[in-house]
Design a protein with these regions (language model features):
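A basic- and aromatic-enriched beta-loop-alpha substructure that forms the phosphate/nucleotide-
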Residues: 10-96
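Conserved acidic residues
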Residues: 6, 124-126, 165
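Active-site-proximal loop/helix segment associated with metal-binding centers of metalloenzymes
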Residues: 55-56, 62, 71, 75-146
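Short, small-residue-biased leader/transition segments that mark boundaries at the very start
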Residues: 2-9
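Conserved beta-sheet core of the metallophosphoesterase superfamily
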Residues: 19-22, 30-34, 45, 49-62, ...
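Structural motif
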Residues: 1, 127-131, 168
Length: 199
């Protein structure tokens, strides 16, 4: 399973959240997730980075992995560009290091790593999984929430240069297809692979 939205390493790192993570670690399947707005990035940074599935991930125990930004994973013969991160619209109302982390926005190094990985793959993947979306997806839709930020503009640049089949993003907590190639996902489960590629 791939999750394109914040998932496990949440704000407080409480015992209840640890219990949920422990439950996920015991599932009989591999779970990969992208980071979003409300991860506790200080806790997440404590997990070691390793090469797996063709890209960089952090193993959280069991079969749970955080996918590092800009990784191109290879799963069941398909390539996935994965890029987490977003900008909280309410960050001024949050407390740094408690329920908001500046690391929610990608660093220069993460943008550069993404471009280098795409270059190494000839700017071609099967699927794109991001937490946020290019501004070109958001403009003129009900998903638009203010001014474009650096991440939106970076994803615009990727969108214009990249060859891909479908792009999925999860930041906006809605299930809506924007086109045959782009979709906002919140609760929907989207099957991937050969038999589902024509959907």
């Amino acid at each position: 399973s791939l999750v394109g939205s914040e998932m496990c390493i949440r704000d407080s790192g409480s015992k209840e959240e640890q219990k949920k993570l422990d439950w996920l670690r015991k599932r009989p399947y591999t779970l990969l997730f992208l980071d979003g707005a409300h991860e506790n990035y200080d806790l997440l940074a404590q997990y070691p980075v390793e090469e797996r599935f063709g890209g960089r991930v952090q193993a959280l125990g069991g079969n749970v992995y955080h996918v590092c930004r800009g990784s191109v994973l290879e799963l069941e013969g398909k390539k996935y560009l994965c890029f987490g991160g977003t900008e909280s619209p309410d960050k001024e109302e949050r407390e740094a290091g408690y329920n908001w982390w500046p690391q929610e926005m990608p660093s220069d190094e993460e943008y550069a790593a993404c471009e280098a990985n795409l270059e190494a793959n000839g700017w071609q993947v099967d699927y794109v999984l991001t937490h946020d979306a290019p501004s070109r997806f958001l403009d003129f839709t009900s998903l638009a929430v203010g001014e474009s930020n650096r991440l939106h503009l970076f994803l615009d640049k990727v969108l214009l240069k990249l060859t891909y089949e479908k792009w999925f993003f999860g930041c906006y907590h809605k299930d809506v297809a924007l086109s045959t190639k782009s979709r906002c996902v919140f609760c929907d489960v989207i099957p991937m692979g050969e038999r589902h590629a024509k959907r």
